């Protein structure tokens, strides 16, 4: 990564900001091929890190407080992704 922090040390918000910056650079279209590949690899690493952080949060939210204060399982219904 070009930043001083390693990807493991980035917060979710920092990683998303980095990913948005990479997307903006690639969308400009004036990036040499080799640099575009480097940006793409960095973006994929940031995307993976964000996904892993979200999965970790989902596991933490596996139990939420019910109205009476007891813990209850929490499940997220995923949207239909359609054809990939």
From Swiss-Prot:
InterPro entries: Exonuc_VII_S (IPR003761), Exonuc_VII_ssu_sf (IPR037004). Keywords: Cytoplasm, Exonuclease, Hydrolase, Nuclease. Pfam families: Exonuc_VII_S. It is an enzyme of class 3 (hydrolase). One of its GO terms (molecular function) is exodeoxyribonuclease VII activity. GO terms for biological process: DNA catabolic process. PANTHER family: EXODEOXYRIBONUCLEASE 7 SMALL SUBUNIT. Bidirectionally degrades single-stranded DNA into large acid-insoluble oligonucleotides, which are then degraded further into small acid-soluble oligonucleotides. HAMAP family: Exonuc_7_S (MF_00337). Belongs to the XseB family. This is Exodeoxyribonuclease 7 small subunit. The gene is xseB.
């Amino acid at each position: 990564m070009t930043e001083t922090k390693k990807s493991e040390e980035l917060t979710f918000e920092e990683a998303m900001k980095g990913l948005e910056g990479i997307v903006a650079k690639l969308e400009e279209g004036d990036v040499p091929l080799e640099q575009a590949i480097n940006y793409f690899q960095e973006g994929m690493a940031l995307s993976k890190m964000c996904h892993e952080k979200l999965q970790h949060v989902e596991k933490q939210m596996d139990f939420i407080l019910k109205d009476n204060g007891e813990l209850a399982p929490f499940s997220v219904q995923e949207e239909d992704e359609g054809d990939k």
